[in-house]
Amino acid sequence: MKTKLTEQSYWVDVQGNINLDLADDNIIKLWIEKNLDLSNINSCIEIGCFPGRYLTIFGNNRIELNGLDFIQEVKFLKQKFQENGFVAGSFINADFTTYVPEKKYDCVASFGFVEHFVNWEVIFKNHFNYVSNNGYLIIEAPNFKGFFQRLPRFLFDYKNYKRHNVKAMDLEKWKKILVENKFEIINAEYFGGYQLWNENDSKNRYFLKIKFFTEKLLFKLKDTLCPNSIDNKSFSCYLGIIAKKTNNNEY
């Protein structure tokens, strides 16, 4: 049974080369720094770490950086991080679905990863095997499930939409899984406001015109229904959870 919604070749094309550039006002970076004291963390691993930019969030706090990815170029990340003054550990070229971790880390993170699998709950739980006792887990995904996010993607970026398992974009299910496995929830929320992006590079002027007016209408409708722009599952572009592993956790 096929469990992956994307192929390795897709990620090689999309991610390209190593890239450690991450803006200071990056939404995901700000969300993590707001909700987690990084000074308590000594080591971190990112699952699906290539091209490397999100690891800089932790590296800027002198945390040892580690990563796992099935893209072969991941093996060059250690040298690149060291050249840029970061503390680098191991960078593993392996398939997360079959790899058995040899050690555990103070913090385990993945960004836009779990939703690319049919069996997303298994993938979600596999993260637990990497987390040390009293360590932290960070999981983030785009929110394609909310109406204001789902409709334009379904209409105008369907190919990319189908690369994602929308069922995985469920914060309540994430919380339930973590609580059942003896994790303490530190933060769980939809965030990022209402933003839209897509991978459809069509230049058809009729397509672009319809897309423009549809998105304009959605923005107006969102502002009417949610005038205070409070983040929620209907329109926010991201969902994320930060949790702490307790000592009595079986993983």
Residue ranges and their predicted role:
Residues 153-154, 187-251:
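A C-terminal cap/extension of S-adenosyl-L-methionine-dependent methyltransferases
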